[in-house]
């Protein structure tokens, strides 16, 4: 859902967005992203479940270039840090993307569930070992009780938090402002 919310934000800013459903391992991941693409009104590139995720990423970038899209957002599997082959897939996806856009990806956003506590730390650790994570989005921060995860992970891995998810609505993905976030602990 984070990707759908990002697509909505970028589209509101006037950008042409293409989504890529490269999480071909998780049941219903492709369908979920298609629902978001329809809701937001952006195109989506997908293949059947079990397809090669790198192939989906490649097709997504080829389509984005052909459509003169400003932004391609590719959803990948691997949220479960213990799936080593999924982590290796990220390296392959990057390599294949660079065949279309030599300096791709321009950003690697790791989406973490803020309600998972220590598991989020382990997930961040595994992802930073597998790929160059440039920023974080931390979801399920509807209350400040889970806020320590944001600060701890960003500090430990020296990765800036770019977005926080504070609800299920399409506008509930917010740009992270550290001073506002800290103030929310005291107000």
Which residues fall in each region the model found?
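P-loop/Walker A NTP-binding module and the surrounding RecA-like catalytic core of P-loop NTPases
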Residues: 1-187
């Amino acid at each position: 859902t984070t990707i759908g919310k990002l697509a909505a934000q970028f589209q509101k800013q006037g950008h042409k967005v293409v989504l890529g459903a490269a999480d071909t391992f998780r049941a219903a991941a492709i369908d979920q992203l298609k629902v978001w693409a329809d809701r937001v009104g952006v195109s989506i590139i997908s293949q059947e479940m079990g397809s090669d995720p790198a192939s989906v990423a490649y097709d997504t970038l080829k389509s984005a270039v052909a459509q003169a899209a400003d932004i391609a957002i590719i959803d990948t599997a691997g949220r479960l840090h213990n799936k080593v082959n999924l982590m290796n897939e990220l390296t392959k996806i990057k390599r294949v993307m660079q065949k279309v856009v030599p300096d791709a990806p321009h950003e690697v956003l790791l989406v973490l569930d803020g309600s998972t506590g220590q598991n989020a730390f382990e997930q961040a650790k595994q992802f930073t070992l597998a790929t160059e994570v440039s920023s974080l989005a931390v979801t399920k921060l509807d209350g400040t009780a889970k806020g320590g995860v944001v600060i701890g992970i960003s500090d430990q891995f020296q990765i800036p938090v770019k977005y926080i998810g504070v609800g299920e609505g399409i506008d509930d993905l917010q740009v992270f402002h550290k001073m506002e976030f800290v103030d929310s602990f005291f107000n």
